[in-house]
């Protein structure tokens, strides 16, 4: 009898010991797996740059959602500012450390070092082809030039407003503009745009649809063209498609994270003459022409007042964002 009891106790103790060993082994294996996984995650995290992607929006929507202006009560600790200037500014200043100097001056106005970006462009024509607006707030300095007044006005109309655009196939279709907010925007290295209005029988009015030489020329070798024709009338178009892209666009409203500072000139360029443009002269301003150092000093002095007229945006934009595809 005692032998049976001892055997039972021995088997019970052996089972407990074996179970304890199995549990410890499982624990060690799980620890190894978890620690190895965490190590892999840490290593990969240092090697991979995360990227946020947007979502497709309906035709009635805008990729540019305005946020409440946070500049009223707090410094710009979480905002970025892009300052766009012509190359002649840096050429005149001729100082390799001028940007660092301005960054320190912006710091005195509440903009932390690293939050202000300086973007150089060659000229108005080149900038209009690819106006990249990356920051929460974007200030564009444009030196007035009477020979480029039309280019400056069209560029201002483009970047101060949001546009919803579709591609156009001008080889197959006729197009008409439905209302005053409907424009055709052409961009490229060289854009020549010709139009031929059509009657109800699709015959040219004062032109032959088979002969582009008889079309009305509305732009010649320009980099940016905003074409406005008579509403409700079909048009046959001829565009230098090898060097230019044309799109059918609808003006949605003001892009309030952009402001233009005209440097010099007798008057501020007025784009509000367009019936589709709501008055927005507070984001189109002028400062007297001086040396470029004086221009930048003036911008630093008044940057916070300028920002008060703008709204911070939810995302940065590049040139493709001007073309909202359906």
From Swiss-Prot:
Q: Which residues bind Ca(2+) 2?
A: 177, 228-229, 231, 301
- Quote the record's binding site residues for Ca(2+) 1: 95, 206, 214, 216
Q: Where in the cell is it found?
A: Virion; Host endoplasmic reticulum lumen
Tagged with keyword Chaperone: no
Show the disulfide pairing: 82-135, 165-249, 191-244, 196-207
Q: Where is this region: CNP motif?
A: 165-167
What UniProt keywords apply to this chain's record, in alphabetical order? Calcium, Capsid protein, Disulfide bond, Glycoprotein, Host endoplasmic reticulum, Host-virus interaction, Metal-binding, Outer capsid protein, Signal, T=13 icosahedral capsid protein, Virion
Briefly state the modifications made to the protein after translation.
N-glycosylated.
What family is this?
Belongs to the rotavirus VP7 family.
Stated name of the protein: Outer capsid glycoprotein VP7
Q: What is the lineage of its organism?
A: Viruses, Riboviria, Orthornavirae, Duplornaviricota, Resentoviricetes
């Amino acid at each position: 009898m005692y032998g049976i009891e001892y055997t039972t106790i021995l088997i019970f103790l052996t089972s407990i010991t074996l179970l304890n060993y199995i549990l410890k082994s499982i624990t060690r294996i799980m620890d190894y797996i978890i620690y190895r996984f965490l190590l892999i995650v840490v290593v990969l995290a240092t090697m991979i740059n995360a990227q946020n992607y947007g979502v497709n929006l309906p035709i009635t929507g805008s990729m540019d959602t305005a946020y409440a202006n946070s500049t009223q009560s707090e410094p710009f600790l979480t905002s970025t500012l892009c300052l766009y200037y012509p190359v002649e500014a840096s050429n005149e200043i001729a100082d390799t450390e001028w940007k660092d100097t301005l960054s320190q001056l912006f710091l005195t106005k509440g903009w932390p070092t690293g939050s202000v970006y300086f973007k150089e462009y060659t000229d108005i024509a080149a900038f209009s082809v690819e106006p990249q607006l990356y920051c929460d707030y974007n200030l564009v300095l444009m030196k007035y030039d009477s020979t480029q007044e039309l280019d400056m006005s069209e560029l201002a109309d483009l970047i101060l407003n949001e546009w919803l655009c579709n591609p156009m196939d001008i080889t197959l279709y006729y197009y008409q503009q439905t209302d005053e907010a409907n424009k055709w925007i052409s961009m490229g290295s060289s854009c020549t745009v010709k139009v031929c209005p059509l009657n109800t029988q699709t015959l040219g009015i004062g032109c032959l649809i088979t002969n582009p030489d008889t079309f009305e020329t509305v732009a010649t070798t320009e980099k940016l063209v905003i074409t406005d024709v008579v509403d409700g009338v079909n048009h046959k178009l001829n565009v230098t498609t090898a060097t230019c892209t044309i799109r059918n666009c609808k003006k949605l409203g003001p892009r309030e994270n952009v402001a233009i500072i005209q440097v010099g000139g007798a008057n501020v360029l007025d784009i509000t003459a367009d019936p589709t443009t709501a008055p927005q002269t507070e984001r189109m301003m002028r400062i007297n022409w001086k040396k470029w150092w004086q221009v930048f000093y003036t911008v630093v002095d008044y940057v916070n007042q300028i920002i008060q007229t703008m709204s911070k945006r939810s995302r940065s934009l590049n040139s493709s964002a001007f073309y909202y595809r359906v």
